[in-house]
A protein has these predicted regions:
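Short, Lys/Arg-enriched N-terminal segments with co-localized hydrophobic residues
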Residues: 1-9
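Sec-dependent N-terminal signal peptides of Gram-positive bacterial secreted proteins and lipoproteins
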Residues: 13-32
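Short, well-ordered, aromatic-rich surface patches in folded extracellular/luminal domains
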Residues: 33-53, 84, 97, 107-174
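Tryptophan-centric aromatic hotspots in well-structured domains and transmembrane helices
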Residues: 57, 105-106
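Short, surface-exposed charged micro-motifs
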Residues: 58-62, 123
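Short, solvent-exposed coil/turn segments at beta-strand boundaries
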Residues: 62-69
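A short-motif feature that recognizes glycine-rich, charge-decorated loops
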Residues: 72-105
């Protein structure tokens, strides 16, 4: 006999997965009715972290493969860590998002503005299945479109959290 509560949870997960995936596709003009790039490589590992002078600016997002499957690790405010499974469809959507954001243009970015006393820093490391990658780091200096692209990455991981009924807006460091 199957557990009704478990069945309901699985239905909600698939509903949110499909909704998030369709929303991501609908918002990307490149994919609205178009086929994805044939040469677009799939993300193998991903790590993005950003920090600032306040705890609420400290976030870390990772995707990696383990023996038991692909996992996303989300760390917020140096206090909350969530480890969630990532499906093939979610990884494909994330790979498409990185391609759409043109994060490859950041590869090799290494800038620091040491004259700023307070500020923000970031680190990005992506490895793709085809062997290519992106490595970028900045302190008080950022590549073009940094805040918009950071927001898109954050939105992807927050959508993943919502699939598991975790509301990032209700999590605080206080």
């Amino acid at each position: 006999m199957r557990c009704k509560k478990g069945d309901d949870a699985m239905k909600r997960r698939w509903k949110w997965t499909l909704t998030g995936f369709l929303a991501a596709l609908a918002l990307c003009p490149r994919f609205a009715g178009a086929a994805p790039h044939e040469d677009m490589s799939t993300v193998k590992t991903f790590a993005f972290s950003c920090s600032g002078m306040s705890v609420d600016q400290m976030r870390s997002y990772q995707i990696g493969e383990t023996k038991r499957g692909r996992l996303a690790t989300i760390e917020l405010y140096l206090a909350y860590t969530f480890v969630l499974p990532v499906t093939d469809a979610e990884l494909a959507a994330f790979s498409a998002l990185l391609d759409e954001l043109d994060l490859a243009a950041w590869d090799g970015y290494r800038q620091e503005d040491s004259t700023v006393l307070d500020g923000e820093s970031f680190s990005l490391n992506v490895a793709f299945e085809d062997g290519s990658g992106i490595d970028a780091v900045g302190t008080n200096s950022f590549p073009d479109g940094y805040y918009e692209k950071k927001g898109a990455i954050q939105a992807f991981f927050e959508a993943l959290m919502r699939e598991y009924e975790i509301d990032a807006d209700k999590i605080g460091y206080w």
